[in-house]
Amino acid sequence: LHKEYRRQRQMCIRDRYVPKPYYFTDNMAIYQLGEHTPDIAASAYVTDTATVVGRVTIKDNSSVWFQVAIRGDNEDITIGRNCNLQEGAVLHADPGYPLTLADNVSVGHQAMIHGCSIGEGSLVGIQAIILNGAKIGKNCLVGAGALITEGKEFPDNSLILGAPARAIRTLNEADVANLQRIANSYVERAREFKDKLKRIG
């Protein structure tokens, strides 16, 4: 696995894409870093294979799914209410660039979220990348594989696609309602997993 990860890392440098997370392992945990301890709401759901480190706040009814990594070593990372961070997502921040997710934000599988702010009700698609200082408005949809470069800003209700990403159109009421439906479904799914998930091997 280490050899494969090194190979993909070299490809990442050459082709500017993010390697698949071969470095994730089981038995991840919640860590204090120095004086900083994650603040996780009692109603939040964090799987036992997720990693949460340091200056991280996770608010009510949010869910952190399998093999998610949230590393709050340089700046505060704030996850609002009713958010969901799906499998393999990575959240980090550089000095001077705190990371903030407003309420009802969905982060898709293997997305990379770095030192940015994402407005209420927005969804970040699978393997999308959002870099330092970027600002995503409310009720935006960031498409799968999109690359949002440093400092880029998008208004509310934007459909954001491409690498580098650009706003394609304005989302309509039905689009926005679907984003909310997805966020709501993860709140319910997390409650179900809390009650019914049982490890058998």
Per-region residue spans from a language model:
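Left-handed beta-helix
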Residues: A42, T47-D48, V53-G54, K59-D60, ...
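Active-site cofactor/substrate anionic-group-binding motifs, chiefly glycine-
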Residues: I77
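Intrinsic-disorder-associated, low-complexity terminal segments enriched in Asp/Asn/His/Tyr and depleted
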Residues: Y22-N27
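C-terminal segments of enzyme domains that contribute to small-molecule binding surfaces
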Residues: M28-D39, T47, L99-V107, A111-M112, ...
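Single conserved hydrophobic/aromatic residue that forms the stacking wall/gate
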Residues: L1-D15
